[in-house]
Regions:
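Conserved RecA-like ASCE P-loop NTPase motor core of nucleic-acid helicases/translocases
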Residues: 117-121
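Conserved Walker A/P-loop ATP-binding site and its immediately adjacent core
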Residues: 122-128
Length: 448
């Protein structure tokens, strides 16, 4: 006979305990336990079960993952080349960032190719979804809508009429009737995700699930939600700005270094095929503290503008603020400048920003940050046709970075004439005739 009992769950890792604890033994996080009531049924007898026999790894046949296009090249890039049959993809992001919009556009393209799509919404009515869809464009009859909150209703329909792709918007609004807890609770999210994963693998259906995020920027619910799915995508960007960055945090079928760039318009999200041109639009010329760097996001080189402002502080402790860059990394470079270059920055405020709302983690941006800080400190504008990249060590040395040839080619394509790079990279380019020909349009190659 089924009965209810109280269990405490960790919101970060899903660790279960019979009592509340201040620190989770599983992930060592503090104050993450929440109380839930769960229904426990009688354990089934295992007498009639069939014995499970393991298979030798040499007898297992492998097959390449079958992929099909989403109709959005930027989304295909982040997914690793398209959608894999039987995959479970989690899409997270801030409210209003465009999660539902990009999935609706994907569904529109797939239905136009003749694929049957099931869009399940637990947050909006049919008319509300139709209003948003009309802004995007015309949909085909193979685009099916289902507004329910019970997972059993979804499973029942899928057994009758198997779709090619299922979209769940969102995972926090879908419940399983067998579990007596509120929607979005740890136990509900774990059970719903586990059953969706089983459905995807057994029926070879690609399933996309939308996840709400917390104020820390992580998907709401247990941390093991991200471990259960095949791919985790995050939408980044300012809701008040026009550009959105789609980044893969986890991908079992592709690289996690690729990004997709979109622009939010009235008609939906538009793909940005040349991010460098967009990110450098409106760049101020002959202004101190501004420099262009070439970052590598996966296999794609992107030119970005780094802006720095160094001014005399009016506080006892100088302020250091960064936007789009690692705060500790900028502080490290400020210390290197003061120790190795003799620049007295301990009495100055420093503000460093990436124009365009991008987040930059590439170590090759170190040299660009240094150039921007020195330019602002001395109030000397840099050459507007110059691109900089290179990693800076604690001893003040400039270290080589990967894919120097790709970075230079991107700079040439965008019309830049001067490239300052690590000496090791420059020597490698000079030894190759092919690389030399690619650099013929650069007027000056300076290695410092």
């Amino acid at each position: 006979m089924a009965k209810e009992k109280q269990i405490f769950f960790c919101r970060e890792c899903g660790f279960e305990s019979a009592k509340w604890m201040g620190q989770c033994p599983g992930c060592r996080s503090w104050n993450t336990f929440c109380e839930e009531k769960v229904t426990v049924g009688a354990r089934k007898q295992s007498g009639g079960r069939t014995a499970v026999v393991p298979t030798s790894i040499l007898e297992v046949k492998t097959a390449d993952e079958t992929r099909f296009s989403t109709g959005l090249e930027e989304l295909n890039r982040v997914l690793g080349g398209g959608i894999v049959n039987g995959s479970l993809v989690l899409v997270g992001g801030d409210p209003g960032i465009g999660k539902s919009t990009i999935l609706l556009q994907m569904c529109r393209n797939l239905s136009a190719d003749g694929h049957k799509i099931l869009y399940v919404s637990g947050e909006e009515s049919l008319s509300q979804i139709k209003m948003r869809a009309e802004r995007i464009g015309t949909f085909q009859k193979d685009m099916l809508l289902l507004c329910v909150n019970n997972l059993e209703d979804v499973e029942e329909y899928v057994k009758k009429d198997k779709p090619k792709v299922i979209v769940i918007d969102s995972i926090q609004t879908i419940v399983v009737e067998d579990i007596a807890s509120a929607p979005g609770s740890v136990s509900q999210v774990k059970e719903v995700t586990a059953r969706l994963m089983q459905m995807a693998k057994q029926m070879d259906i690609a399933i996309f699930i939308v996840g709400h995020v917390t104020k820390e920027g992580t998907v709401a619910g247990p941390r093991n939600l991200e471990h259960m799915v095949d791919t985790v995508l995050y939408f980044e960007g300012d809701r008040n700005a026009g550009f959105r960055i789609l980044r893969a945090v986890k991908n079992r079928f592709g690289s996690t270094n690729e990004i997709g760039v979109f622009e939010m318009l009235e008609t939906g999200l538009s793909e940005v095929n040349n991010p460098s041109k967009v990110m450098l639009a409106g760049r101020p010329l002959q202004t101190s503290g501004s420099v262009v760097v070439c970052s590598l996001e996966g296999t794609r080189p992107i030119l970005l503008e780094i802006q720095a402002l160094v001014c005399q502080t009016s506080f006892n402790l100088p302020r250091r603020t960064t936007v789009g860059l690692d705060y500790n990394r900028v502080n490290l470079l400020l210390a290197v400048l003061e120790k190795r270059a003799g620049m007295v920055l301990s009495g100055s405020d420093a503000y460093v920003n990436i124009a365009g709302g991008m987040r930059l983690d590439d170590p090759a941006a170190d040299l660009g940050i240094v150039f921007a800080l020195v330019s602002s400190f001395r109030n000397r504008p840099l050459d507007e046709s110059m691109v900089v990249f290179g990693e800076v060590g604690l001893s003040g040395e400039v270290r080589g970075v990967s894919a120097a040839e790709q970075r230079v080619r991107e700079a040439v394509k965008m019309g830049f004439r001067t490239c300052i790079m690590p000496k090791t990279n420059a020597e490698h380019l000079e030894r190759s005739e092919e690389h030399t020909s690619e650099l013929q349009s650069l007027e000056d190659l300076v290695c410092r």
